Amino acid sequence: MRIYFAPLEGLTDAIYRRVHHATFGGVDKYFMPFISPSTSLSFTSRQQADIAPRENAGMPAVPQILCKDAGLFLEMTKLLRDAGYAEVNLNLGCPSGTVTAKGKGAGMLKDPDALARFLDEIYSKAVLLVSLKTRCGYESIDEWPRLLDIFLCYPVHEWILHPRTYREFYGGRPHRDFFLEAAAKAPFPVVYNGDLFRVSECREMNRFDLMLGRGLAVNPALAQEAQGGEGLTLDSLLLFHDRLYREYLKWWPEHAVIGRMHGVMYYLIQALDCPAPVKRALKKSADTAAYTDAVRRVFTESAITQDIHFTPPGT
């Protein structure tokens, strides 16, 4: 079983990936948050920092492209090849409304014929290995057989399948029977992604390669423990937090660091039995002094929870 860290926009940047890789084991590949190329084929400064080989040295990292224009996709793969990458991942699964409204991400599943034309072109001309990250439909699971037939036609490097439709977003239960069908029929590796929040859930699927996202964001030792290593401890969680905090403070302005660390702690605090007043103090912290004091209280007044898992908002 290989385990991949899913790209989480606004969280798993190069600094986060490096610190996680240095602190915990068990992750075989880190997928970068998507690049959505424009006709200028230029990168933002943040994207340049994220994909720079020196920022990803010593760990297996895969760039991801969000794009509906085959020509732009192919030009971007050339730039990534020249930067030293051997693989690129095509995002056909992002369910964000702002993405799908432009016909990108999961929005590309809406028109199977156009999707097939796009895949025809990129797989006939790509200069890198191309893996896919997809869902199992757009409006309905009735679309699955047609999409399955399409994906099986191409020399896919790996197929990462989140077996929900776009409309299902992250609700309900994943259609694992669709994943099992794909894994049985595909001549290439099929990787399972979806609701893997506990060690027991990972081990239940350990016949397959897995992609973990929100579960790893809550429990950064999840992949390590699922592979037979040490589980999360308060000391290892504190070490991860402090390394991450120090690295951001080296490179980012204070307000940006506090905003990012609030995003990090949104997940990490779910691994802790933390008193409500301490959570409130953390949420209110707006500068490094207040944040540092609140985090000190988090790690002195909390314990690792018995059942570590991601809890979706509103549940």
Set out the residue ranges of the language-model regions.
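Flavin-dependent oxidoreductase catalytic cores
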Residues: 1-315
